[in-house]
Amino acid sequence: MPELPEVETVRRGLEPAMAGRLIAEARVNRADLRWPFPPRMAERLTGQRVLRLRRRSKYILADLSGGQSLLIHLGMSGRMLVSGAQLGEFFHDHPAPSRHDHVVLEMEGGARITFNDARRFGAMDLVATEAAEAHPLLAVLGPEPLGNAFDGAYLAARLEGRRTPIKAALLDQRIVAGLGNIYVCEVLFRAGLAPGRLAGSLSRAESEGLVPLIREVLLEAIEAGGSSLRDYRQADGELGYFQHTFRVYGREGLPCVTPGCSGTVGRIVQSGRSSFHCPLCQR
């Protein structure tokens, strides 16, 4: 599933084609994805101007001129793709099979925005902009890891006394929004913390030290366009390339990259997810 860097990369890719532009025509090609689409969604989107595109955790919100926001979740395989007749500045050829094009937005200026989702685990909804944060998918989320509310004091307080593994704590969207399996593995490796270590056992310094590392990993991944392991593509159909710089994720059996370490990357399963770690570096 796309994590924060992938969703932020998609948002940035959509912005030139959508922000400030009118939705000249919307088409909805099926009744549902993961959940049913809102009633008359195509009719309600047509004629609306996109005021801005923003991201909350792993969700994209397009704020519209009529006072509603289009809430978008990519799910496991969803793609928001920019294409159009005017190839050039930000319009591209459509890189995915059209049979999975479930929602199409024809934008003022000639761009076409397509929500393509082969596995149909994605979702779209229309919500009142002023009440968007109260939407059931958003209301439970913790602070953004790249925002000012997420700092060392906050994280130390949330981890104190917790008897869950530190990896599970960082994946808990109520504690911090947008982190997923890939980036938590990478963060814990850089921090030298074993994924199975209890969150409450971390010293205050260790807890506070996670915050700059989380930001570091996320910003590096955004700069690289995210990680393409299976379905994820940027808005122009291109692959992300942060996967080429993984230090631990997916490297089971390979030597640890830490200079002077003789360890080999191992893999354990936690709550059904693979955790990659160096048993020598991470304690």
Swiss-Prot record:
Q: Which residues cross the membrane?
A: none
Residues annotated as catalytic? 2-3, 58, 273
> Which key words are in the record?
DNA damage, DNA repair, DNA-binding, Glycosidase, Hydrolase, Lyase, Metal-binding, Multifunctional enzyme, Zinc, Zinc-finger
A Gene Ontology biological process noted in the UniProt record is: base-excision repair
Where are zinc fingers of the kind FPG-type found along the chain? 247-283
Identify one Pfam family in the record: Fapy_DNA_glyco
Residues bound to DNA: 100, 119, 162
Q: What is its cofactor?
A: Zn(2+)
Q: Which family does it belong to?
A: Belongs to the FPG family.
- The protein's name: Formamidopyrimidine-DNA glycosylase
Tell me the gene name: mutM
